[in-house]
Design a protein with these regions (language model features):
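Repeat-blade elements of multi-bladed beta-propeller folds
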Residues: 1-6, 31-56, 81-105, 109, ...
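Extracytoplasmic beta-rich repeat domains
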Residues: 20-41, 66-88, 127-156, 173-175, ...
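Beta-strand initiation motifs
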Residues: 14-19, 63-68, 119-123, 205-209, ...
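Beta-propeller domains
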Residues: 2-24, 204-206
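Blade-level signature of beta-propeller repeat domains, shared across WD40, Kelch, NHL, RCC1
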Residues: 432-481
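Phosphate/diphosphate-binding loops
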Residues: 229-278, 292-303, 308, 413, ...
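Structural motif
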Residues: 107-111, 177-178, 195, 251-253, ...
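Beta-propeller blade signature
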Residues: 59-64, 109-122, 186-206, 255-260, ...
Length: 481
């Protein structure tokens, strides 16, 4: 378990602390209070984790002893890292692979690195923002490299050992002004590769095998950075191995794992930005009326946090049901143009004030159970409190999720009926897990620590008391049958 500058190993049955790793950080990082890490990785006898100061470390799983410590990036004058590594690593074929995010004031955009799992040495680096003169480099409206930002990778990737591919999602650009300018010259597009894309990389070399850009020229902060689920679904009566992902708009795209070819899309109906999706290519056509205009505020659904965000979905491979945590929101969206010099200095130029949907009824939290193979919705649960945790689905037909009102709840996977809930000290804004010890089944979730989902939804439900609280691990034992 990670919290700020510390990592703890606990006895899963008793909660006893087995070891703790504490990292010394520059004063500017406030002991890692602002850091967010979504996962750790274990490979062999080593545990791998990013740190708030831009390093990746390997620890012995049994003792917490440092095996190696590698600086992925150089700190600034105040000791802060120019990028974050909030997604956590994935390990494939002896490579620890992790992406960077933010870098809102760092031109050139983000990247994904592959480190040797034994030594920590960097093996390769892939830039998620295409450079001029390289493949995709002509998709930035002719902007020089120092005016290209974003492409953050702030969730972990997935690995397919059969195809030897790792899949990552990317975010948007941080300054839309580059893409709003008139086309500078023939042959230059404004697609902004490789933002809002699924990337398939060779883990040995970091070479791009294929990419699929879900939203070209994203000027609305619609990140497609979330989990890349490796699923097998019937397509035209034949079991087909797919990679499935969904963006902030709660549109899900299914692609062939080997080629990236579009297979199908599912729109859950909580957005007003995309008016149509090409069934052959998956290209999403945005509503031209929502094009940013200086001095004009426009209604955008969802808000910048999205109808969905980093909280992961859960999938039942037997029934093909995907369980999706959602928040029903909109935003008043505006754009302030900036000069090329201001763009090169960093920062962002779009703004959004969260607001309820015009057709809303005061309920913002939503769980949707959808058959991915057919598109049929099995059930929907709606409630006032926005959801702030990943979903956990179990073989015992339970679905667990946490909400802003501090409740951690279990629902029947087949019907959506509420079966159990308990209120914690703070919002359970993490990814719950389940495990067994000596035949006993447990469910664990972390609460507290704040985060953008908790703060970004707070204005919708001002009556909900959600104290920041200290980070707390809660563990529940499931009753024996």
């Amino acid at each position: 378990m990670e919290s700020g500058a510390s990592i703890q190993a606990l006895n899963g049955a008793t909660g006893e602390v087995l070891w703790q790793y504490n990292r010394s950080l520059p004063e500017s990082l406030r002991n890692g209070q602002q850091s967010r890490m979504k996962n750790l990785a274990i490979y062999g006898d080593a545990l791998y984790a990013p740190t708030p100061d831009g390093h990746v470390i390997a620890l012995e799983t049994k003792t917490g002893k440092v095996i190696w410590d590698h600086a992925v990036m150089s700190p600034d004058a105040a000791g802060a890292a120019p990028f974050s590594m909030t997604g956590g690593p994935v390990v494939a074929k002896g490579k620890v692979i992790i992406g960077t995010s933010l870098g809102i004031n760092t031109p050139g955009g983000n990247y994904i690195v592959g480190l040797d799992a034994t030594s920590g040495e960097e093996s390769w680096r892939f830039n998620t923002i295409a450079k001029p003169g390289e493949p995709g480099g002509d998709s930035w409206n002719g902007a020089p490299f120092e005016e290209r930002y974003g492409g953050g990778v702030w969730t972990s990737g997935s690995y397919d050992p059969v195809r030897n591919l790792v899949y990552f999602g990317t975010g948007n650009t941080y300054d839309v002004g580059t893409l709003m300018l008139p086309q500078k010259r023939v042959g230059e597009s404004r697609d902004a590769l490789y933002t809002d894309s699924t990337l398939a990389l060779n883990p040995d070399t970091g070479k791009l095998v294929w990419h699929s850009q879900h939203m070209k020229r994203d000027v609305w902060d619609l990140d497609w950075v979330f989990e890349q689920s490796l699923l097998t679904l019937p397509v035209n009566g034949k079991p087909t191995e797919l990679v499935v992902t969904g963006g902030k708009t709660a549109i899900f795209a299914a692609m062939d794992r080997s080629t990236g070819k579009h297979v199908f899309s599912r729109d859950l109906g909580l957005q007003n930005i995309v008016t149509s999706i090409d069934p052959a290519t998956g290209e999403q056509i945005p509503n031209p009326a929502l094009e940013p205009e200086p001095g004009k505020t426009k209604l955008l659904c969802p808000n910048f946090n999205g109808a969905r965000n980093w909280p992961t979905t859960a999938f039942n491979p037997a029934s093909y049901i995907l369980y999706v945590p959602l928040v029903e929101t909109c935003a008043d969206y505006s754009w302030t143009p900036r000069s090329p010099g201001q763009i090169a200095a960093g920062g962002d130029d779009i703004h959004a004030a969260t607001r309820p949907r015009p057709d809303g009824d005061g309920k913002f939290g939503r769980i949707e159970a959808i058959n991915l193979a057919t598109g049929k919705v099995l059930w929907i649960h709606r409630q006032r409190a926005p959801l702030v945790s990943s979903l956990l689905a179990t073989a015992g037909d339970l679905v667990f999720v946490g909400a802003l009102d501090r409740f951690f709840s279990a629902y029947h996977a087949g019907t959506g009926e509420l079966l159990w809930q308990t209120q914690l000290n703070a919002a359970p804004n993490s990814s719950p897990v389940t495990y067994s010890v000596q035949g006993e089944q447990y469910v664990a979730v972390v609460s507290g620590g704040g985060g953008p989902l908790s703060s970004g939804s707070a204005s919708l439900t001002p009556e909900i008391d959600n104290p920041a609280g200290g980070t707390t691990l809660w563990v529940f034992k499931l009753p024996s049958r």
